A protein has these predicted regions:
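Thiamine diphosphate
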Residues: 105-339
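Glycine-rich ThDP/TPP pyrophosphate-binding loop and its adjacent helix/strand module
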Residues: 1-109, 280, 294, 298-339
Length: 339
């Protein structure tokens, strides 16, 4: 049980963060439905539903005794007499364990008709909007197509001998001006990772005003990467996020997920050097590039490299790297820049 490893009051924590919180019996269907209905009515803040559950609820062992709250039910499937006893205990037929009960079939058939009506209404609303706003509708369709945007890279003026993070800022400035559906983020380092090249051409997203295109994520690298994954899954926007390369370690689970899901998120990692100034050895990437390069060589489910990894040597190569990143709509891109 969680009480063996922590005594944190999760509900109080999230209420303090400004969330709506509902605590329920996670094994009670009626309470789950009631909580979901309440959550749909909450506006202006996120909702957390804490369902307190019993592991292996309803499961029985081979001897007929309870298997509930036993950690073995978490990592291994029930088998033999335990499987038979559990199916019987839950009201099913061990000889036909995957049957659909009549009341379930009736419920889903009814819901299917409700959803058809909802979809028809939504499609009608979308068509009416598209007919009234043909230019916006065409732009929306273009954005959701997922194809690479057209960019005039001749507008990107680079300075010789610039550090590649500064060269990246020049590229981001052009992207902010030419790609209206791009959103760039930084983990509290926009001035250092030079994502401020993008920010200077727009403004930050804030509560109540989403006209900007820059997401200030704060010191939350993993959260920032996950948000970018969510944007990519939603579609219609091109997400990019930046931080120091050494902090890519905090993002690694999300980067792996982006690679597994073949999502074209642009990861901007700067300060790839043994000499990164006054920050010292804690900010000097050593093993990080080897990890990312290994990920690049692993094939995804489409048979392609799971990630495009680019480490340009100078300002001109930085422009080419950004062009390749924007043209890559199949996988994540890792852009590694020097200080």
């Amino acid at each position: 049980e969680t009480k063996e490893v922590m005594n944190e009051d999760t509900a109080a924590k999230y209420r303090a963060l400004g969330w709506e919180v509902f605590e329920i019996n996670g094994n009670d269907v009626d309470q789950i439905r009631e909580a979901l209905d309440k959550a749909k009515k909450v506006e202006g803040k996120p909702t957390l539903i804490i369902g307190k559950c019993i592991m292996g609820k309803g499961a029985l062992k081979a001897d007929g005794s309870s298997y509930e709250a036993n950690c073995k039910t978490h990592g291994a499937p029930l088998g033999g007499d335990a499987f038979v006893n559990t199916i019987k205990h839950l009201g099913g037929d061990p000889e036909n364990p995957f049957q659909i009960f009549p009341e379930v079939k009736e419920l889903y058939a009814k819901r299917a008709e409700e959803l058809k009506a909802i979809c028809a209404e939504r499609y009608a609303e979308e068509k009416a909007w598209a007919d009234a706003n043909p230019e916006k509708a065409a732009q929306q369709a273009d954005w959701f197509s997922g194809k690479a945007p057209k960019i005039d890279w001749s507008k990107c003026v680079q300075k010789d001998n610039d550090a590649t993070r500064s060269a990246s800022a020049a590229c981001l400035s052009v992207l902010a001006q030419q790609v209206p559906n791009m959103i760039c983020a930084s983990a509290d380092l926009s001035n250092s990772d030079k994502t401020d090249g993008f920010l200077k051409q727009t403004k930050a997203l804030v509560k109540g005003d989403f006209s900007g295109a820059f997401f200030q994520a704060g010191v939350a690298e993993l959260t920032m990467a996950c948000c970018c994954i969510g944007m990519s899954l939603h579609g219609g926007v091109i997400p990019a996020c930046g931080t120091f390369f050494v902090f890519s370690d905090y993002m690694k689970p999300a980067v792996r997920m982006a690679a597994l899901m073949q999502l074209p998120v642009k990861f901007i990692w700067t300060h790839d050097a043994f000499r990164v100034g006054e920050d010292g050895p804690t900010h000097e990437p050593v093993e990080q590039e080897a990890q990312i390069r290994l990920m690049e060589k692993l094939k995804n489910h489409s048979g392609k490299n799971s990630c495009l990894v680019l480490r340009p040597a100078d300002a001109k190569e930085t422009t080419v790297a950004w062009a390749m990143a924007m043209e890559n709509t199949d996988t994540p891109t890792a852009l590694i820049f020097s200080r």
